[in-house]
UniProtKB/Swiss-Prot annotation:
GO terms for molecular function: nucleic acid binding. Pfam families: G-patch (PF01585). It comes from Yarrowia lipolytica (strain CLIB 122 / E 150) (Yeast). It is found in: Cytoplasm; Nucleus. Belongs to the SQS1 family. Residues 27-37 have a biased composition (Basic and acidic residues). This is Protein SQS1. May be involved in splicing. PANTHER family: G PATCH DOMAIN CONTAINING PROTEIN 2.
Length: 812
């Protein structure tokens, strides 16, 4: 296909390459013989197959391909379509400018209406890499010009060191610009997405006059670039022989930019600085007093912000001059401060008129309180803390005459002078004993719990004998441990020492002085409770006596009052018990009732057993009144019984459809199958493992008049042939009884039963001559018939074995 651009035009056409899609060609082409069989020569579309090719291009597929009526795969004339004019679709797809130049002409007019297409060869071959290269050069030139212009504007105003580097001296400029040409290399890196990816960095050369010198071969592009750079670059820029340090320039630019930003802020509000200066002069100066407090000399304070959400105030704070390298801003605003006051770690805050409503105002300190009053109040609080409640408790005791801290309130004898010094005596006793350093008293480490028992207290003890176990110890064991710790005997152990150590170990025992024995009752004591208890006891005795003389049924009331009836004497089976009644008539009446109740219970029990055997307690009998066979025959069933059950099933008035037999073994199930065939019943097996049983279904031919079949069945299986049932009490003996008659079973072999006293093993063959043991004996000198042992004193005949069934023997 020719390379270049195509134009839709009608003038100045080349007749050699013009063709029309709406007409037949004026001069038909001559094709080879293959074209006649492969495709059609007419311009009509091919109809056969799934092809899309026309007559001019020939078929492009086979019989099932994309061609015409089924020809060769490439068409008629070899390379015919390549030598002829290209199609309209291929020319559009391979054109580079059809979308931009001819979009309106192509899509607004019908493609069938375009009569002529002219292909004109372009002046030069289309090269995409050349276009990308031109674009890259243009971008690079623009970047270099901008960089040089920025350096010229910023550098002279920064620092003298940079001016010397860039050659800002006017004398050097006049001398060196005339004599020689100084070239400065400026490197600019850019991403090239074209085909030329090998050169990532392009170097641009700048001479003394500000002209750029590059290494491109195109002279026309160089002239255009030089003209643009001459117009933008200033003549004052003179490059040094060495390359410019870009990092130094960047730092200088950043510093100048920061100064410019600060100047702009001052220009926005010129009056703000003067007002701030006036307020600072009027306000008191605050000094960071870190020398007065030695603890704050080396302390580093954390910078914090105010709790007010006000952008304007934050801007003012950021521009506030700091008195030191680190400023500490307090979160609490100061309401009023005098000139003599020195604050540490705070800065004077201005009065906020437009504060955020969410800000919390902290109340200021009220300085109107008298310092002496405040001092007295603090001392009184300290005095209250130093005192204890013991003095108050003693005062209340003396005033009320009562003991505090117990569960009961009782009066104390006022004449007893020892109660006044009760606490002092305890303190003296506690000081007499010493607590061991290891915290172990004897073998006791700790008392976990305490409980009261009938014979004293019991303690849950952790001891050194077994650290992983806790045991309940009585008071005797605790006293032994305490006495062992003190080095005295148990009889010499004081009770005060025992209570002191038990309390320190964690035990909770009651002080004997506070128990009932130590209570001194006053004149207010009343014994009315004892009289009431005695009255209740007499009433209970009379009630018990009256119930003893009454009937046996009324003795239940005695059980509610804790009465236990007398134990009856031992008696034999079915003997009347002794009721312990002195009245002979009552005794005879009780014996009669007992005999009758026993007889009634026995009769009822026998009746229930009979009904259970008949299957009347089963679910089937309760629902439908039918006794199941597994309940009726729990162990055995004969063939005659099975035949009768089948006849009852067939002649039943309600005509049930299914008859279920009890679970049986495989041999007995096969017998029932043969029996069902005599009555034209359909047998079926249900259940799994030991619960497999035979179910007989009624059919249209079921009847009881097949006497010939029944007689033949009984000839093989007699009427007394037993069918073993597998019930809940199915035992191993029943299983053996089932399996010993089965064919192919190992149990069907005849067993050898030895009788009592029978000799066994006498027919066993002698040891062969090839036996290793016999060979060893022969080498040692033994011969056949000779006894074993030294000098042949051993037995020469084997020991006789006799069967003993009645006894098992010693060690069995």
């Amino acid at each position: 296909m020719p390379t270049g651009y195509h134009n839709f035009c009608d003038d100045e056409l080349d007749e050699s390459i013009n063709f029309n899609y709406n007409r037949k060609p004026s001069q038909p082409k001559d094709y080879d013989d293959d074209s006649r069989t492969s495709g059609r020569t007419t311009p009509k579309r091919a109809r056969g197959g799934r092809g899309r090719g026309s007559g001019d291009r020939g078929g492009r597929g086979g019989s099932r391909g994309r061609g015409g009526n089924g020809g060769s795969s490439r068409g008629g004339k070899k390379n015919g379509w390549r030598d002829e004019k290209p199609s309209l679709l291929s020319s559009i797809l391979n054109s580079r400018q059809h979308a931009s130049e001819n979009r309106e002409h192509m899509f607004n007019k019908s493609l069938r209406g375009a009569e002529f297409i002219t292909f004109i060869k372009s002046a030069e071959v289309y090269d995409p890499s050349k276009l990308l290269k031109d674009v890259g050069v243009t971008v690079e030139e623009a970047n270099v010009v901008n960089e040089v212009e920025d350096i010229h504007i910023i550098v002279p105003e920064v620092i003298p060191e940079v001016q010397d580097v860039t050659g800002a001296d006017a004398q050097l400029e006049d001398q060196e610009s005339e004599d020689e040409e100084v070239v400065t290399t400026i490197t600019e890196t850019y991403a090239d997405d074209g085909d030329n990816q090998e050169d990532d960095d392009d170097e641009m050369l700048v001479d003394g006059n500000g002209q750029l010198v590059d290494d491109y071969d195109d002279d026309e592009d160089d002239d255009d670039e030089d003209d643009e750079i001459d117009e933008e670059v200033d003549d004052d820029l003179i490059a040094d022989e060495n390359a410019v340090d870009v990092s130094t320039l960047q730092d200088a630019i950043n510093e100048v930019a920061n100064d410019t930003i600060n100047d702009d802020r001052k220009e926005e509000d010129p009056s703000e600085g003067s007002e701030a200066d006036d307020e600072e002069d009027e306000a008191a100066e605050f000094v960071m007093d870190t020398e007065g407090d030695p603890d704050m000399v080396d302390m580093e304070f954390m910078e914090t912000d105010f709790a007010y959400l006000n952008k304007k105030k934050r801007a003012e704070k950021s521009r506030t001059p700091l008195t030191s390298s680190t400023a500490v801003i307090s979160d609490r605003p100061v309401a009023s401060v005098s000139a003599d006051t020195t604050l540490v770690g705070s800065v004077a805050s201005k009065k906020r008129h437009n504060a955020d409503p969410r800000a919390v105002d902290i109340p200021e300190y009220n300085s109107d309180i008298d310092p002496e009053v405040l001092k007295d109040y603090i001392e009184s609080i300290k005095n209250e803390d130093e005192g204890s409640d013991a003095e108050n408790i003693d005062w209340i005791r003396s005033a009320l005459g009562t003991q505090l801290g117990g569960t009961e309130q009782y009066y104390v004898d006022s004449d007893d002078s020892e109660n006044d010094d009760f606490d002092d005596d305890d303190e003296d006793d506690e000081e007499e004993y010493e607590w061991p350093e290891n915290g172990t008293v004897g073998c006791i480490r700790n008392i976990v719990a305490t409980r009261a028992a009938s014979q004293g207290y019991q303690f849950m003890v952790e001891h050194t004998l077994d650290a992983d176990m806790e045991e309940w110890w009585n008071e005797d064991l605790i006293r032994d441990s305490v006495a062992e710790h003190l080095g005295v005997s148990v009889s010499e152990l004081p009770d005060e020492a025992y209570r002191w150590y038990v309390t320190r170990l964690g035990g909770d025992i009651e002080d004997p002085d506070l128990s009932e024995e130590g209570i001194n009752y006053s004149d207010y004591y009343d014994d009315s409770d004892e009289d009431e208890k005695a009255r209740e006891a007499s009433e209970m005795d009379s009630l018990i006596q009256s119930l003893i003389d009454d009937e046996v049924d009324d003795r239940k009331a005695l059980m509610d009052h804790g009465y236990t009836p007398p134990m009856t004497k031992s008696r034999g089976k079915n003997q009347v018990p002794n009721f312990g009644v002195n009245d002979p008539e009552l005794q005879a009446q009780l014996e009669k009732h007992w005999v009758n109740s026993r007889a009634a219970k026995r009769a009822k029990r026998e009746q229930r057993q009979a009904m259970r055997k008949q299957g009347m307690f089963t679910k089937e009998f309760k629902q439908g009144g039918i006794i199941p066979l597994h309940a009726k025959y729990p162990i055995l069933m004969t063939v005659e019984e099975a035949r009768k059950e089948i006849e009852i099933f067939i002649n039943a008035p309600n005509k049930p459809m299914v008859l279920d037999f009890p679970p049986m073994g495989a041999e007995f199930r096969s017998v029932l199958k043969k029996l069902s065939a005599c009555y034209h019943l359909k047998p079926d097996i249900h259940g799994v493992q030991k619960s497999k049983h035979v179910s007989m279904l009624r059919t249209s031919r079921t009847s009881c008049h097949n006497n010939n079949y029944i007689q033949k069945f009984h000839d093989k299986f007699p009427k007394k042939f037993k069918l073993v049932i597998r019930n809940a009490k199915y035992s191993t003996e029943q299983y053996l009884y089932e399996t010993k008659h089965q064919k192919g079973s190992k149990r069907s072999a005849v067993r050898v039963h030895n009788r009592e006293g029978e000799i066994v093993g006498h027919e066993a063959p002698a040891i062969d001559d090839s036996n290793i043991g016999r060979l060893l004996l022969q080498k040692m000198g033994w011969t056949t018939g000779e006894g074993l042992g030294a000098q042949s004193r051993g037995i020469s005949e084997p020991i006789i074995a006799k069967v003993k069934i009645s006894k098992r023997g010693i060690g069995a």
